[in-house]
Amino acid sequence: MSLTSSSSVRVEWIAAVTIAAGTAAIGYLAYKRFYVKDHRNKAMINLHIQKDNPKIVHAFDMEDLGDKAVYCRCWRSKKFPFCDGAHTKHNEETGDNVGPLIIKKKET
């Protein structure tokens, strides 16, 4: 085997390894971007309400509701858990379409 053919094989080997490494890097970055999900939601919904609780739950007796009750679902209301219309500004800023939860007695 001459020096020229050995050198040629080495150049081909380096080129093949470079292409394989580049392809592997692009594949890894694509995998991380599209398939690996971060378990923490980067756009938190609840920004300031009862942050010391692991889960926020509000329960109401049906008898206490009266004829109609309107509850916040965007977590932006100053009267939380009741809706004050803050979702309108939230929807304009984010392009979201969230609205309140409205509970009313059935007409008999």
Curated annotation (Swiss-Prot):
Substitution effect: residue 55 to I: Fully incorporates and stabilizes the [2Fe-2S] cluster upon in vitro reconstitution. Abolishes alkaline pH dependence of the midpoint redox potential of the [2Fe-2S] cluster
Active site, renumbered: 55
Residues that hold [2Fe-2S] cluster according to the record: 72, 74, 83, 87
One Pfam family this sequence matches: MitoNEET_N
Reported effect, residue 55 to E: Slighly reduces the transfer rate of the [2Fe-2S] cluster
Cofactor requirements of the protein: [2Fe-2S] cluster; pyridoxal 5'-phosphate
PTM comment: Ubiquitinated by PRKN during mitophagy, leading to its degradation and enhancement of mitophagy. Deubiquitinated by USP30.
One GO cellular component, as annotated: mitochondrial outer membrane
Reaction catalysed by this enzyme: L-cysteine + 2-oxoglutarate = 2-oxo-3-sulfanylpropanoate + L-glutamate
Superkingdom classification of source: Eukaryota
Extra remark: Binds pioglitazone, an anti-diabetes drug. Binding increases the stability of the 2Fe-2S cluster.
Oligomeric form and interacting partners: Homodimer.
Protein name per its UniProtKB record: CDGSH iron-sulfur domain-containing protein 1
Origin species: Homo sapiens
Lineage: Eukaryota, Metazoa, Chordata, Craniata, Vertebrata
